[in-house]
């Protein structure tokens, strides 16, 4: 799933480890989400969105969801 995490993280001068610590996950999970290898769970997506002060749909691109189902 496409997302803006890398862009938002860099705008906020956060490393992958910084964001992982903030949202309670691992750096590897953040890396996998950023490159599209892993889709964040709803609770994790919510924590990421809340940290950046955005809605989930402002970070994650759901247009491909219908094709994946």
Name each model-derived stretch.
Residues 25-38:
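Recognition helix of helix-turn-helix/homeodomain-like DNA-binding domains
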């Amino acid at each position: 799933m496409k997302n803006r995490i890398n862009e938002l993280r860099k705008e906020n001068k956060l490393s992958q480890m910084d964001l992982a610590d903030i949202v309670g996950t691992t750096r590897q999970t953040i890396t996998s989400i950023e490159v599209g290898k892993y889709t964040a769970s709803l609770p994790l997506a919510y924590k990421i969105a809340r940290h950046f002060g955005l809605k989930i749909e402002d970070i994650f691109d759901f247009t491909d969801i219908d094709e994946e189902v």
